[in-house]
From Swiss-Prot:
GO biological process per UniProt: post-transcriptional regulation of gene expression
Designated name of the protein: RNA chaperone ProQ
GO cellular component, one term: cytosol
Biased composition (Basic residues): 137-146
Keyword Magnesium among record annotations: no
Natural source organism: Klebsiella pneumoniae subsp. pneumoniae (strain ATCC 700721 / MGH 78578)
Keywords annotated in UniProt: Chaperone, Cytoplasm, RNA-binding
Entry's localization field: Cytoplasm
GO molecular function: RNA strand annealing activity; RNA strand-exchange activity
Amino acid sequence: MENQPKLNSSKEVIAFLAERFPQCFSAEGEARPLKIGIFQDLVERVGGEMNLSKTQLRAALRLYTSSWRYLYGVKAGAIRVDLDGNPCGELEEQHIAHARQQLEEAKARVQAQRAAQQAKKREAAAAAGQQDEGVRRERKPRPQQPRRKEGAEQRKPRPVAAKAPREERLTPVSDVSVLTVGQALKVKAGNNAMDATVLEITKDGVRVQLTSGMSMIVRAEHLVF
């Protein structure tokens, strides 16, 4: 006995039934309502063929009768058919209402799935946009520096030398008669000059008081102002 090929999916089983019973099943287009109890007829007619089991036949029938094209065919005035396409009675109103409800629920599920997919795409696009914006912010180009002319020497600013404080110009006292008591002047001591105040003008010189409080008589050539 030769081995028969095995059908692995419900779609393959439906394609086999449409080829075997073209007056009952169809692989595309609007489907005709099936006779009530057609499952038992299938078991009797194709039992053992193509290694089909009852489970496979039941699953294929469930997929076929829940498809949109089959539910569209379950409408007022439609006639049920058997495996050979013979009429087997008109559809009842309750069966038509049930098919209409199944079709509406199936459409609602598809719309909900599409809406969820659209929302995920929008979220992914928004997240990608934020990430790109963050990368652009991180990689913000630095302002372009003006190009130096070719051959131009790079000049470094010269350090500015600190100006030495100007030496205070002092006038030597040549005539003590020009001095007055309380007048501020300086007493020369080597290269330094100390602040002092005139206390008294004597014949021996000028008595002055230093800022330290010490008083002394100084000759005119040691006084400046």
